[in-house]
């Protein structure tokens, strides 16, 4: 019968014990935040690529003449308000982060005297309305960066684990 002897098993066991006592929630939160960054960057790039109306103001759209562009001020509002929200943990223990729009732009209307809500404008552009042709800039950016986001999260988790094992 052959005999195999392993050395260093105690060290490995200690490292596994350290890993089991590590701040797993903190590791996950850092990874999720890092995974959101490429998505946010891609959405900002997609906003920069949106077509702006030549006149500087948005004409009224209709079912026959669908809007396909936005105003310069709407675009600026989207770029300025785009960001990553703080990490949240829901009641089921899932750790989430939202990438999206906050606040209002400078286009004041009778309906929106404080300015148009940036989230409303983004949703209208992305999904379309009865008078605006949809331009799926958010959906495309998210799909385009999915693998990059997962890779960033994996790298973050692996770096945290490596740090524990190198102590």
What are these language model-derived features?
Residues 1-97, 104-106, 114, 118-167:
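Short, Lys/Arg-rich flexible segments
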């Amino acid at each position: 019968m052959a005999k195999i002897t392993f050395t260093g098993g105690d060290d490995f066991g200690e490292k596994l014990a350290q890993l089991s006592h590590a701040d797993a929630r903190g590791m996950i939160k850092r990874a999720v935040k890092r995974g959101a960054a490429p998505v946010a960057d891609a959405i900002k790039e997609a906003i920069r690529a949106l077509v702006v109306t030549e006149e500087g103001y948005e004409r009224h759209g209709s079912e026959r003449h669908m809007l396909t562009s936005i105003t310069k001020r709407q675009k600026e509002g989207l770029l300025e308000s785009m960001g990553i929200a703080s990490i949240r943990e829901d009641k089921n223990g899932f750790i989430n982060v939202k990438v999206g729009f906050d606040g209002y732009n400078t286009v004041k209307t009778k309906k929106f005297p404080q300015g148009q809500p940036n989230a409303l404008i983004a949703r209208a552009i992305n999904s379309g309305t009865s008078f605006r042709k949809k331009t799926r800039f958010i959906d495309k950016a998210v799909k385009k960066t999915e693998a990059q986001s997962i890779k960033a999260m994996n790298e973050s988790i692996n770096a945290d684990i490596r740090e524990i094992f190198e102590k």
